[in-house]
Amino acid sequence: YKGVFTGVGGPCLITPNRLTLPDMLRKKGYETAMFGKWHIGLTAFDKKGKPINRNGLDAVREIDYSRKLEGGPLDRGFDHFFGTASCPTTDWLYAYVDGDRIPVPPTQIVDRGPLPKHPYSRDNRPGMIAPNFDLEEVDQVFLKKSLEFLERHKKQKPDKPFFLFHSMQAVHLPSFPGKDFKGKTDSGPHGDFIFEMDHIVGELTKALEAHGFADDTLVVFSSDNGPEVPTVINMRKTHKHDGARPWRGVKRDNWEGGHRVPFIARWPGKVKAGAISNQTICLTDLMATCAEIVDVKLPNDAAEDSYNFLPVLLGKDKGKQIREYTLHQTISLAMAIRRGSWKYLDHKGSGGSN
């Protein structure tokens, strides 16, 4: 996957013929949209039409921005996309992707001099930046796009179901909260960034309510990994806060703090407010769960690692584990397996960054 996570370095990790969640829902009549970071690879081309399958500043300079991108959200089941190829404030290409093109190409090297300097400002690589790309306001741009989609959908297709995937930069390092959120907390820049994330979720929730979608919409809030090393170390020192507590480990580890994340669901009339489950689920399980909700029988070559947790959401699982086992992997490709309350790590230590 060299290049996939750090720029327009394709190919996409999802193979072209594999059934995806948005593709499945689109076939059931849903309008599908994604706004935010894609981060699983898409392919750009140079002026000779050759694919650029690597990352770095030199690769970004070789891109022919007049050509379409391949392997992005529009090729994997989404009707609409506006966002970035990978982490918008981390990786070498600092420009927005609109559909399958980059309408405003990067024109200059990122000047990181004016950016905030604090323990949470690392992970901002040198790269090329577009004139309309403000490193501190990307999440507000993503929010604006999602809100516009909901408003447009209400006006144009009020009776058509929709699937919206809002993929935030917050709270991935570097912690660059928007100008309206700086100083909002007494927990420093990272606390302010968390505040901004909370604001975004609130604005999306209010929009669902304002347009009359809230009572018939399943909302899921989650994350893709545990907290980053600098946030844990520095927040422990300065604010007595530990984003992984009580679990050991951080992002990229096989210890539980590396992969155990929040999972919050809101579905009025279906999910009991305030209910808590001790089920072990994986984000891959969303595919089988949504298939059950929309009455789709998944083919054998789709979502092989996905388990239906709809009974858990509805409070009908009676405590029975839905997963036979769950696999985990670190940045160094070290593996671990979990079955019930037992865990086996095929390595010494965390296997990752800790």
Features from the language model and the residues they span:
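Formylglycine-dependent sulfatase
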Residues: 1-353
